[in-house]
């Protein structure tokens, strides 16, 4: 693997599973030093062990990104330990099973807004502070195809992820003269751990959904990780404020 990111420091939220974990692995393969956050210490250790197998290293910090002070503490550590931050992938997110909007509870609304939007904004605030110190940075936010395509039972999730797209398209102007780009990715249906479990427990539904997708299959987490790294590459320096769908044609 080309070590194109050797010497670069990267931060990933939600790095203990799914798209975040795949992004940590891809960055390590490309030579970056990675700090990732999450809430599951056992899963984090598995990620760290895998990174060592890949010939790199990653550091983990337990962090609830919905608490701004927790986020401040993590980025204080990054500043002290590394003195800079080159890349940031704000991947952490949550959802609920398909739920009609009038059946959605207050707790569900709070959870999705707090994690998907407020937590992401807290991370961006601290990322930008460090990046401005060195007039360089690449930020990628994970939104969702739900923000762009209507579907039943997805209203609150879509609202939180549409907020991510909105933050991306506007925050990019605040930092564009500081050498910082801000872009987002809207994944379609991706075969995360949750989808893999459905693959076996609801095989017919899984097969039907896959066949109805334009490309005929679910996406893989690695394909989203490749998209994140695309925005981190030097060749993408002129791209900012873009929301890139990676959704197999949806």
Per-range role (PLM):
Residues 136, 217-246:
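C-terminal substrate-recognition "lid" of short-chain dehydrogenase/reductases
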Residues 129, 173-177, 237:
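Alpha-helical segment proximal to the catalytic Tyr-Lys
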Residues 72, 95-110, 133, 153-156, ...:
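Conserved mid-core segment of classical short-chain dehydrogenase/reductases
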Residues 124, 160, 168:
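Active-site helix of classical SDR
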Residues 102-122, 136, 140, 164, ...:
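Catalytic Tyr-X3-Lys loop
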Residues 32-46:
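Conserved glycine-rich Rossmann-like NAD(P)H-binding loop of the short-chain dehydrogenase/reductase
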Residues 9, 16-17:
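Conserved glycine-rich cofactor-binding loop
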Residues 144:
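Residue(s) in the substrate-gating loop at a strand-loop-helix junction
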